[in-house]
Amino acid sequence: RIAATEAAASGIHWTFAPMVDISRDARWGRVMEGAGEDPYLGSKIAYARVKGFQGNLGDVDAVMACAKHFVAYGAAVGGRDYNAVDMSDRMLWETYLPPFKATVDAGVATFMNGFNDLNGIPATGNKYLLRDILKGQWNFQGFVVSDWGSIGEMVAHGYAKDNNDAAQIAITAGSDMDMESNAYRNNLAQLVKENKVPIALVDDAVRRILYMKFELGLFDDPFKFCNPEREKRELNNPEHTKAAREVAAKSIVLLKNEKNILPLSKNTKTIAFIGPMVKLNRANHGFWAIDLKEVDSTYIISQWKGLENKVGKNTKLLYAKGCDEEGSNTDGFAEAIAVANQSDVVILSIGEAWNKSGE
């Protein structure tokens, strides 16, 4: 809800979220975007996220949600993005479809195709998925957008001869909007003239897109989301920051606590904070975050700063970087060991570089 309020205040009325892919292969680079491996939990979170983003679509603080990536994108062979998926109907229906059905039940406005193929047919050109299940059995009334260039990607899959062929396959299958491949823009009109694509399919796609614009109220006021004063008021609102902190605190899972070392005693005299992430602001933003050189860092608190603000006056903090965010240089190990030997407690902050996961 807060993300929608702030996004809408900045003039945004459509977000490409939630990502509701079930992820069971840790090698896949987009695991961190979703809710994990369980279809029940994934469905509950998917439903809640759609409700949070959209609220009542006509409201000024609502944004259209987009359920992605339909479907089985997270089951690509070997965890290789854009790869093939070989899956039984039972696995599809019991595990991978439920979170998407939950978004339909929540009234999600849009769907996005997956880059993968499913049993030999790319998701973007898969009539069984888009027309038979999504728009047929589930009676989805919104529209389907391709993923970035995924209509053209059907050529790379070896399923379409060229973009002209890909456009025909995609619109026939039920993909309503072409994002970035220009296959519709360059080919759809001619395909209709040649009677290779019924005009009724184009009409249906256009109707679905316009319907959602009406639902947002954009035809009544195309600038309803453009309000600089509201943007100043809503962005980094203290109540929003407080809620974000509360959500983060409630979401942390403690996997191990040997000798009951946590919570740290306020009487701890010396704490060593070691690792390349300790003073790196970017580390707190995770993957798919904008390059921090381009944003205001006023509200970014490093792990070091956070701990520094929290410990008592009688606690001494020591720091050693130890190693770089990525690479194999061990020159900093000696300093890290020395700092550790001077301390009562060591906090080690290491992890994957921000740009090592994703597509």
Positions of PLM-derived features:
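Glycoside hydrolase catalytic-domain context in secreted enzymes
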Residues: 1-359
